[in-house]
């Protein structure tokens, strides 16, 4: 039973990284389209840090940001994907890494960014997993050491991507929103409540986050099971 469960988790993980396993698929092309739209969304300056969030759990934010990290890396950019969801982290599962040392260790000065970052089997893509789940995620993410971490990441990487908790669940995403160059809101087609999505947008803007657009996922299409659309706010 345990082996079967592990196999199911592995299969779900491989499906979630379609840009790696099947880069020529229609869905992978949609991710590349999102990447292009992100890059052209701000004409006067490059976007160095991007946060991806959702209004509620299970809307696909972690799958979205993992695949965006892959397509940015495939473009030749040195990418760091940071798991800032310190409550329900998933990056270490997706990329099959241990999670003994990560964000929380760096923020509490128990490790350096250089020693905590892990290389993946995708060229140019590195991850900083969450590390041990702390009792005070919001305080850590809003600390001065978070600003130091981001500044150091800018020195070492071309693009820094943050996976964060859902906006309506906790304040973590709002805390990070104004530290990032841009934010993407993921919406689950047919599931996300419109009022919830609107409330999430309002909270991000109130936190002085720069909302770049919305990704609509799980939209049924004739050609494929999933469709990702990037639109402005």
Give a label for each model feature.
Residues 1-233:
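P-loop NTP-binding module
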């Amino acid at each position: 039973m345990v082996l079967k469960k592990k196999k199911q988790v592995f299969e779900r993980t491989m499906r979630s990284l379609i840009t790696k396993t099947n880069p020529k698929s229609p869905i992978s092309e949609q991710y590349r389209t999102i990447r292009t739209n992100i890059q052209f969304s701000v004409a006067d300056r490059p976007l160095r840090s991007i946060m991806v969030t959702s209004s509620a759990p299970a809307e696909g934010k972690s799958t979205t940001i993992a695949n965006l990290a892959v397509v940015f890396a495939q473009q030749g950019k040195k990418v760091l994907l940071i798991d800032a969801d310190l409550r329900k982290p998933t990056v270490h599962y997706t990329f099959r890494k241990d999670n003994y040392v990560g964000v929380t260790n760096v923020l509490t000065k128990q490790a350096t960014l250089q020693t905590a970052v892990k290389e993946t089997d995708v060229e140019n893509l590195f991850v900083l997993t969450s590390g041990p789940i702390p009792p005070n995620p919001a305080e850590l993410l809003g600390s001065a050491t978070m600003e130091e971490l981001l500044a150091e990441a800018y020195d070492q990487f071309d693009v820094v991507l943050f996976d964060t908790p859902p906006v309506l669940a906790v304040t973590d995403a709002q805390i990070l929103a104004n530290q990032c160059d841009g934010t993407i809101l993921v919406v689950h087609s047919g599931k996300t409540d419109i009022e919830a999505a609107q409330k999430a947008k309002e909270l991000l803007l109130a936190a002085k986050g720069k909302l770049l657009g919305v990704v609509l996922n799980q939209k049924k299409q004739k050609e494929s099971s999933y469709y990702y659309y990037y639109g402005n706010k």
